[in-house]
Amino acid sequence: MIQRAEQFSPNSVEKDLAILEAVAQRLRLQGHEVTMQSEAALAQGRQPDFIFSMARHPEILAILKFFSIPIVNAPAGTQNCARSTLETIMTRIGTPMPPREGNDGYWLKRGDAAAQERGDVVFAADRAALDAAIEGMRRRGIEKYVVSAHVKGDLVKFYGVAGTGFFRCFYPTDDGQTKFGDEQRNGAAHHYAYDVASLQQEAERLAAAVGIAVYGGDCIVRADGSFCLIDFNDWPSFSRCREEAADAIASLVKVRR
């Protein structure tokens, strides 16, 4: 099992490690031999039969591509979660997405990798602020980025394990858990009614297109019940539903062999 490097777990190091350890515990109870290692020290020597990986570092993903064993999440799928690539996939398969233009501000997100610090996801109140934020990213050497209009509605976080039936949704403003505080931008949840099964269907379809099994993301549910996906990630921490998620993830050993 490969832990995620701290640079790719902003404000979530302990939570990310906790879900991996929970899965490892279940695998050991099933009789599997499990070893845990850091992303920065990919083990040398005997090749395992199966890898559960939270790795995100480009060099590690490149190495994992040469392994001829099942890997969850697959390195190519994890690479596809870079926002520029992800946006292309979402557009191609028709995933509900926020518009590019609007009257309520914009979101600018680095496009070459998952967010590693607060400045990788920026809210801009207007076009002038957006231009300034883009220039700020360029000064940091980030040339790939995505822009979307802010969408009013309930922010809903979802978590899933493809092919297992596991899918859970939560309102982050209800429990106050946050990574960078951006969840507050949409305000307290109104708990608008929406079709959870439809959201799961869209999430599973996107997971298949991206090429990952363990996923999470964010969506906005509008007052009329329609929704759009605003984020999609490989292997989140599942901190709101860790025990259930660990059961589902551990079951992938049988499904993927």
Regions found by a protein language model. Name each.
Residues 124-210:
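Phosphate-binding site of ATP-dependent enzymes
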Residues 111, 150-151, 159, 218-220, ...:
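Anionic group-transfer/hydrolysis microenvironments
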